[in-house]
Amino acid sequence: MPARQLAVAAPEKWHIDTKPGSFSARWRWFNLSALFLIPFTLFWNGILIGMATGVTEGFTHPERLLFGLAVPHVWVGLGLAYYCLCLFLNSTKVELKEGMLIVQHSPLWWRGNRKIPSGELQQLFVVEKRGSVSYELCGLTRDGKRQTLLTGLSDESSARFLEVRLEQALNITDQAVAGELRR
């Protein structure tokens, strides 16, 4: 086993459970950015609520003509509110259990839940997402297809930790993959 795999430390505030042939990592989404996003979300939605109450008062205000233009802003406001709730309540769990690699975001739904037979994975690797400072854990299946397993990891060391520990649990020998983040 390469020395690199032995040197990867678990990220702070992650709950790790390792048993022979299995692995589980869980972490909460909350970070300080949530505290800055809440006032913005309240301000955004407050303006929309103020507009809605002004527009609906007997439909006498000329702003009622702008009501249709507010619909996209309402969707953004609802999305921001839901995202704030997810930041406070959600956690992500990655586990190997009963021959399956399971990625689950809960308790509130979020895209990216996965359940993949672990025997289909030939290689795991980390990719830096273009246009942002986040990382993805990807897998190469036995039939040569690339599959994104987890997105939105905020630092390279967390992504590397998952790659290394899952490869160890799956008895996968680490190999270079075209397009992966250099070590």
Give the label of every model feature segment.
Residues 26-92, 181-183:
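Alpha-helical transmembrane spans
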Residues 25, 80-114:
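Conserved beta-hairpin
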Residues 21-28, 103, 136-140:
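Generic recognition of long tandem-repeat/solenoid scaffolds
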Residues 101-102, 113-129:
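Phosphoinositide-dependent membrane-docking surfaces
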Residues 14-16, 31-42, 69, 125-138, ...:
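Short, low-complexity cationic-aromatic patches
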Residues 32-34, 101-104, 110-111, 144-148, ...:
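Short loop/beta submotifs within extracellular cysteine-rich repeat domains
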Residues 130-183:
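A membrane-cytosol interface segment of integral membrane proteins
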Residues 2-31:
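Cytosolic juxtamembrane N-terminal segments of multi-pass membrane proteins
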